[in-house]
Regions:
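A feature for the membrane-embedded catalytic helix bundles of lipid/isoprenoid biosynthetic enzymes
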Residues: 1-30, 103-379
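Short amphipathic alpha-helical coupling elements at transmembrane boundaries
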Residues: 27-34, 84, 88-91, 98, ...
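Short acidic/polar alpha-helix capping motifs at helix-coil junctions
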Residues: 36, 49-51, 167-168
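Helix-loop junctions at the membrane-solvent interface of multi-pass transporters
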Residues: 37, 57-61, 287-290, 346
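Membrane-embedded alpha-helical segments that form the functional core of polytopic membrane enzymes
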Residues: 40-96, 113, 130-134, 215-217, ...
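Loop-to-transmembrane helix entry/capping segments in MFS-fold secondary transporters
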Residues: 94-98, 320-323
Length: 379
């Protein structure tokens, strides 16, 4: 019975690399976690710690440390599979667990980008712009993935499948039609979606083979190919929808803008958060580049802002909004652009702004969310 429950704990709609490699190992760790009575959140934090140490190894820049970082990144994602399997095995699901699993994945991935850029800098390479562009690409894709899936679910169109739910660890998986497909075509479709397993495999292997510069060359190319295929299908499906914006607070809760609304895109409003993030990040990149201030500090500033937008996303997926006071302290898109523009052109010390955003978006906002949901450990 235990073996059957363990087998049934596998998540549906998983990626090729996860199914045929990662979960072969994660099942063993899940069995061990059950025996020692570990909780899903404890496993998530272990995976988080391993992922952060992986990023730290990448900062060293040497081949041996890069190899260690690549191996640890794979171990991190194997352990990351365990928290979901353990939750499904024990039937212990929580909003806190879903939020923690989602945000730690994003932090690990972007800290690895940071680590690779720092390591490359020690070898005389300037890869800050590619690292930031890769973070922007992934943010644009992630937000649109989640929002498209939830929009389809809300519209409840008969021609779409019900998408994977937020609590089921959605990452790069798009709803598929019910028509049967050949096994090869099915798995090729999974791979080209470029989910987290495949992404982290590419990061690990490319960093070992050719270093950070190779990683930041290969990753955007593969991400672009994936986006071309995925968005082609999504646009076709969206054109079949009613010419009306989505209902509820899903999109409005992610606006984070006093002026920019993009209401004109109507049925394509699932793209609104991604487009707003692209506008803000590209303008910040332009400001920092022309002022020659692309470095660790500016990466941290943009990362904390990106984290803030992910926080808004995860709250909206649970039909919640960030408290007004937190949004006001975050200055909205317009306020942040004004502040950072003045600071960059005025040659201020940007470290203070980085600390402010880190304390606000990473610490205060996270604590507010966790404390507000402590009473809902199991749903």
């Amino acid at each position: 019975m235990g073996q059957l429950r363990l087998k049934m704990a596998n998540r549906a709609n998983d990626g090729f690399y996860s199914v045929f490699f990662l979960r072969k190992f994660s099942k063993l760790l899940t069995w061990l976690a059950v025996r020692v009575k570990a909780t899903p959140n404890q496993v998530t934090l272990i995976s988080f710690a391993i992922g952060l140490y992986s990023a730290f190894c990448f900062t060293k820049g040497s081949f041996s440390q890069t190899l260690l970082g690549a191996v640890l990144l794979q171990i991190s994602i194997i352990v990351d599979c365990v928290d979901g399997e353990l939750a499904r095995y024990t039937r212990k699901f929580s909003k806190l667990g879903a939020w923690l699993d989602a945000v730690t994945d994003r932090v690990k991935e972007y800290m690895v980008f940071l680590g690779l850029a720092i390591g490359a800098e020690k070898s005389g390479e300037d890869l800050w712009v590619p690292a930031l562009v890769m973070m922007l690409i992934q943010t644009f894709r992630h937000l649109s993935d989640y929002n498209f899936a939830r929009t389809v679910k809300l519209r409840a169109e008969s021609q779409f499948l019900t998408p994977v739910d937020y609590a089921a660890d959605f990452d790069g998986i798009v709803p598929t039609e019910r028509e049967p497909k050949g096994r090869l075509r099915y798995w090729l479709g999974k791979i080209i979606q470029f989910p987290i397993g495949e992404r982290w495999l590419v990061i690990s292997t490319s960093a070992v083979i050719g270093g950070a510069s190779f990683t930041f060359t290969v990753m955007p190319i593969l991400a672009a190919i994936s986006a071309l295929v995925v968005y082609r299908g999504r646009i076709a499906r969206t054109l079949k929808m009613e010419r009306l914006p989505s209902r509820g607070i899903l999109i409005s809760a992610q606006q984070d803008s006093l002026i920019l609304k993009l209401n004109f895109i109507k049925r394509f409003d699932w793209l609104t958060p991604s487009l707003l993030r692209a506008i803000e990040t590209l303008l910040l990149l332009w400001i920092f580049i022309i002022n020659e201030q692309i470095n660790t500090v500016t990466f941290i500033i943009i990362f904390t802002i990106v984290f803030h937008h992910y926080d808004n996303l995860y709250r909206s997926l649970q039909n919640e909004k960030k408290p007004v006071w937190l949004s006001c302290l975050g200055l909205f898109i317009e306020g942040r652009l004004l502040l950072l523009g003045i600071a960059a052109f005025g040659e201020w010390n940007l470290s203070y702004i980085a600390w402010y955003f880190a304390l606000l978006f990473l610490l205060t906002s996270s604590l507010q969310w966790v404390l507000s949901h402590r009473a809902n450990k199991v749903r």
